[in-house]
Amino acid sequence: MAQRKIALACSVCGSRNYTITASATRTKRLEVMKFCKFCGKHTLHRETR
């Protein structure tokens, strides 16, 4: 199974703070609560393509 790099972007300010590797066959976008150093708080981060 091939892995691909995915960037997680903050839903508030839009900065791409995290990168992860995930399966290329996933159909849904990943959404997790992570700390954004630019906003200074935990915000929802979404997968970008």
Swiss-Prot record:
Biological process annotations from GO: translation
The record, for Gene3D superfamilies, names: Ribosomal protein L33
GO molecular function list: structural constituent of ribosome
List, alphabetically, the InterPro entries matched. Answer: Ribosomal_bL33, Ribosomal_bL33_sf, Ribosomal_zn-bd
GO cellular component terms, A-Z: cytoplasm; ribonucleoprotein complex; ribosome
Top-rank taxon: Bacteria
What Pfam family is a match, any one?
Ribosomal_L33
The protein's UniProt keywords, in alphabetical order, are: Ribonucleoprotein, Ribosomal protein
Which family is this sequence assigned to?
Answer: Belongs to the bacterial ribosomal protein bL33 family.
Listed name of the protein: Large ribosomal subunit protein bL33A
From the UniProt record, report the name of the gene that encodes this protein.
rpmG1
